[in-house]
């Protein structure tokens, strides 16, 4: 081996493949005890070596643990691991996916600002953008057709601060055309935030296609076992918030809570940290500090356990989802299968570009000529599938979105995202495929 070759380590894992980094990135054996597994640091606070060190940490002159509301060593390992898997410079693990989405937006936009978003998003995100953020003075324009790039261009205003979309939306299962949308965002001087929950970085890394910030509900496939709530923001470090001080004043004006610190100048691309950390550190030391959506060390640990098998689980999820989708397509009682992995999908070709290993394991289908009541009966007949609001579990899951996860939307809004009364959503698990198909047949038997 050449002396010039950098040997990968947990602290610098760039030379390792994805499957290795999901296990090792960010964590070496515990220096004090030699513990091989990640310790759970179940503590509220951390002892400072000196009064000077304490002062430096509070002033952000030195990075290190202060209080578990802001960071914790267990949490930090998982943040570094997810940042490595997504290709970002840093990450912030939070109490839920909804907290991650909220912080990702509020870190940039405030009262009087404007967001351009795809309408094809999770129901909770749609509500956040349309109602809750509107209460805070942030207006969102949802493009009618996220595949129409001209609509993204036309929606931009002088006060637009960011674009937002989901890589593979739940439950419409279209595929966001990240590269041209990112280009339009950058032409207008704003970042693109992409929710990558459904595919995970094993199937798609939005930063490689131009996204600036990636968010996840870590509750789903990153954790993978339906045990722990969490969310994460990953920053690419590529967007320079200091390039337009007028558009991003919160990054370019002195922060009153930190004695004049200027995020873009002091933590940005030319800072002493060697990377543009202005976005991710601002989210931590301002939003998280002040509003407190902190993840518990135990939940961070559980999500880390899930990450260790991410690639193996996703491969099995995709294998089963592919078989379920083709089985459904061959069923005369099915009107339409909604999944970008089947050739009948309008987004099949785009999925081949962005997601060659598969578009995730969340799929939907409509029952031919079924009423809302018959569709609910279908769901109730299943025994192996769990009727839950979650996705991303090793277990196979089912739900009727029109009366549950998306019930807050109007009939017109439901139609726009493809949630019809006869629509069923599946999150295909990793059980034996024969058992999954046999259980789905129980539902079809109720229609006969």
Q: Where would I find each of the regions flagged by the language model?
A:
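PLP-dependent enzyme catalytic core of the Aspartate aminotransferase-like
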Residues: 2-6, 130-131, 139-140, 154, ...
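Conserved PLP-enzyme active-site core in the AAT-like
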Residues: 6-13, 22-24, 28-31, 91-330
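Short amphipathic alpha-helical segments
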Residues: 63, 89, 299-303, 308, ...
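Pocket-edge structural micro-motifs
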Residues: 27, 42-46, 69-71, 95, ...
């Amino acid at each position: 081996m050449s002396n010039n070759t950098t040997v990968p380590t947990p602290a610098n894992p760039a030379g390792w493949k994805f499957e290795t980094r999901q296990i090792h990135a960010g964590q070496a054996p515990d220096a004090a005890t030699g513990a091989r597994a990640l310790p759970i640091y179940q503590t509220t606070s951390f002892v400072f070596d000196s009064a000077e060190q304490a002062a430096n940490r509070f002033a952000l002159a030195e990075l290190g643990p202060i209080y578990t509301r802001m960071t914790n060593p267990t949490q930090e390992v998982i943040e570094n691991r997810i940042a490595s898997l997504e290709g970002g410079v840093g990450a912030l693990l939070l109490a839920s996916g909804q907290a991650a989405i909220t912080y990702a937006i509020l870190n940039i936009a405030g009262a009087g600002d404007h967001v351009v978003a795809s309408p094809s998003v999770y129901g909770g995100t749609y509500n956040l953008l349309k109602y809750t953020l509107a209460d805070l003075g942030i207006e969102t324009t949802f493009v009618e057709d996220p595949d129409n790039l001209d609509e993204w261009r036309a929606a931009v205003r002088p006060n637009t601060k960011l674009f937002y979309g989901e890589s593979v939306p739940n439950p419409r299962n279209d595929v966001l055309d990240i590269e041209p949308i990112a280009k339009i965002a950058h032409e207008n001087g704003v970042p693109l935030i992409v929710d990558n929950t459904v595919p995970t970085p094993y199937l798609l890394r939005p930063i490689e296609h131009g996204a600036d910030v990636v968010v996840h509900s870590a509750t789903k496939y990153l954790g993978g076992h339906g045990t722990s709530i969490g969310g994460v923001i990953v920053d690419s470090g590529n967007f320079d918030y200091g390039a337009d001080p007028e558009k991003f004043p919160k990054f370019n004006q002195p922060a009153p809570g930190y004695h004049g610190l200027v995020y873009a100048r002091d933590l940005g691309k030319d800072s002493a940290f060697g990377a543009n950390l202005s976005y991710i550190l601002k989210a931590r030391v301002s939003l998280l500090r002040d509003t407190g959506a902190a993840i518990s060390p135990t939940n961070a640990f559980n999500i880390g356990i899930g990450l260790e098998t991410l690639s193996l689980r996703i491969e099995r999820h995709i294998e089963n989802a592919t078989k379920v989708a083709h089985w459904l397509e061959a069923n005369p009682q099915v009107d339409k299968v909604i999944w970008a992995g089947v050739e009948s999908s309008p987004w099949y070709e785009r999925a081949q570009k962005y997601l060659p290993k598969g578009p995730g394991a969340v799929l939907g289908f409509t029952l031919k000529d079924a009423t809302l009541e018959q569709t609910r009966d279908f769901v109730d007949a299943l025994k192996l599938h769990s009727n839950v609001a979650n996705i991303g579990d090793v277990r196979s899951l089912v739900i009727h979105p029109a009366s549950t996860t998306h019930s807050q939307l109007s009939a017109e809004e439901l139609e726009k995202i493809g949630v019809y009364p006869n629509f069923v959503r599946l999150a295909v698990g990793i059980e034996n495929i024969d058992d999954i198909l046999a259980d789905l047949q129980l539902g079809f038997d109720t229609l006969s």
